[in-house]
């Protein structure tokens, strides 16, 4: 339990820290997000992962983020992946989220451990709700997600280019292998 608390505290500090560049803080998209449509499974196909001495999502396989809107308006989040291979140990995080900007529903807060919160920004979302990019204000981390686990190389490269346009160093993005027989 101590390690989990330490992970949450340090992750929060990293996610809300000062940016090390001259870019303004990352902003979420301006158009409204339909929360019901956004809920469900998102396959994490690429990321600039959290990778520290105390916790790491580097070398994740079969990463999936699931969102469920609860009756009280919170967003129950489950992030699951296999560490170091498709047969690796399953890792799971279960933060609680909520909408911070109710005008657009594109800026959330995530809480892994009370009272610590971190900003969670929907920085890109296609019109069909098939691909999204989630970022943090200081551009330390990013997650590229798709409704399908297997996206073509052209789609993946287009999304990595969007990450670059958002001000991230796209050379840090790691592709997350996905291999599913059925889901």
PLM regions with names:
Residues 1-7:
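Bacterial N-terminal signal peptides that target proteins for export
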Residues 7-15:
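Bacterial N-terminal signal peptides
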Residues 18-183:
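A beta-rich soluble binding module of mature secreted/lumenal proteins
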């Amino acid at each position: 339990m101590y390690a989990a608390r330490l992970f949450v505290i340090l992750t929060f500090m990293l996610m809300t820290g000062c940016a090390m560049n001259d870019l303004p803080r990352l902003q979420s998209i301006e158009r409204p997000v339909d929360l019901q449509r956004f809920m469900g499974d998102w396959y994490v196909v690429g990321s600039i992962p959290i990778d520290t001495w105390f916790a790491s999502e580097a070398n994740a396989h079969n990463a999936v983020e699931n969102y469920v809107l609860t009756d009280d308006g919170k967003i129950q989040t489950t992030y699951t992946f296999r560490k170091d291979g498709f047969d690796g140990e399953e890792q799971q995080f279960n933060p609680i989220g909520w909408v911070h900007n109710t005008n657009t529903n594109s800026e959330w807060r995530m809480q892994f451990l009370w009272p610590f919160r971190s900003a969670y920004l929907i920085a890109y979302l296609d019109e069909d709700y098939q691909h999204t990019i989630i970022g943090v204000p200081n551009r330390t981390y990013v997650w590229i997600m798709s409704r399908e686990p297997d996206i073509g190389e052209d789609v993946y490269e287009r999304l990595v280019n969007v990450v670059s346009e958002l001000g991230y160093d796209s050379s840090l993005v790691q592709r997350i292998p996905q291999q599913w027989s059925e889901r």
